[in-house]
Amino acid sequence: MESIILSIAIFIGVLLGTSVGTFSGSGISAGVGASSGSGISAGVGASSGSSTSVGVGTFGGSSTSVGVGTFGGSSTSVGVGTFSGSRTSPDVDAGSGSSTSPDVGAGSGSSISAGVGTFSGSRTSPDVDAGSGSSTSPDVGAGSGSSISAGVGSRIGTGISTTMNARVAVLITAAILSAPVTAIALLEARR
């Protein structure tokens, strides 16, 4: 009888010691996130429509990046400027249709990231070049309607968390560990 109680206690203890999360519809993963429609991530963000990203932003329509700005025809960016057709900002030059800048340049209706620009027309920059409707950054680049993440991204519709696989593994392990104890307890009970 004590063995049965012990095996049940082991099984429950292993289950309680496992935290599990699952994601359906869209997912957020530690450090990396990607979505179609909108997405939030710490470090890298990509979206088609709008997104918020810390450090780096991927642009397909409009986006907001901490320390960079929001761009959709016109925008205001911390330390950069406001853009509608054309703009002038300290240490940054941009025309309407094309731009050349030592650091960052942006055309009409496009966007700027730290050392990275997306341009409606054409531009030249020492760091990164991008066409209309897409952007490339030193870390992650994504076009409109798709996203690429430097680590792992959960896609819309279904999201599978690695902790779900961990939970299945723990359940199997708990069953294996408790099976011999349960079998011995049953044999002793029959005696």
UniProtKB/Swiss-Prot annotation:
The chain crosses the membrane at residues 168-188. GO terms for cellular component: membrane. It is found in: Membrane. Residues 82-148 are annotated as: Disordered. The keyword Transmembrane helix applies. It is a single-pass membrane protein. Residues 1-17 form the signal peptide. Keywords: Membrane, Signal, Transmembrane, Transmembrane helix. Completely overlaps YRF1-2. This is Putative uncharacterized protein YER190C-A. It comes from Saccharomyces cerevisiae (strain ATCC 204508 / S288c).
